[in-house]
């Protein structure tokens, strides 16, 4: 006989929230302007997306939501707005032009920290 917990038929185990997941933080981040457009005086032409930083990361794991920064689609994926250098399309050119994506975390956290939910 095993010592497993007994669940009623059809009952689901309670869902666990993954560590590092903060939906309220990401919701606030989506309301912000692109940090790259803001820093470099560019016009934001596409919606803001949450970019989970990749520079300085040494695994395939996504960084926690608190390490995400607001980027327009053009600076992030570059699939719809091709007028900008997109991090996921041209990572070396993006890094040369704008620096490390991790450099924008502190400013993002400061702005979101001043918001009230």
For the regions a language model picked out, list residue spans one by one.
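Zinc-coordinating Cys/His ligand positions in small cysteine/histidine-rich zinc-finger domains
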Residues: 72-75
């Amino acid at each position: 006989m095993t010592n497993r917990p007994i669940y009623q038929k059809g009952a689901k185990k309670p869902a666990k929230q993954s560590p590092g997941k903060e939906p309220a933080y990401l919701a606030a981040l989506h309301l912000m302007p692109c940090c790259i457009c803001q820093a470099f005086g560019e016009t934001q032409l596409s919606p803001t997306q949450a970019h989970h930083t990749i520079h300085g990361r040494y695994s395939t794991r996504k960084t926690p939501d608190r390490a995400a920064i607001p980027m327009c689609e053009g600076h992030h994926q570059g699939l719809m707005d091709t007028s900008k250098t997109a991090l996921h399309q041209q990572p070396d050119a993006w890094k040369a032009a704008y620096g490390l994506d991790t450099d924008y975390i502190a400013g993002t956290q400061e702005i979101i920290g001043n918001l009230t939910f």
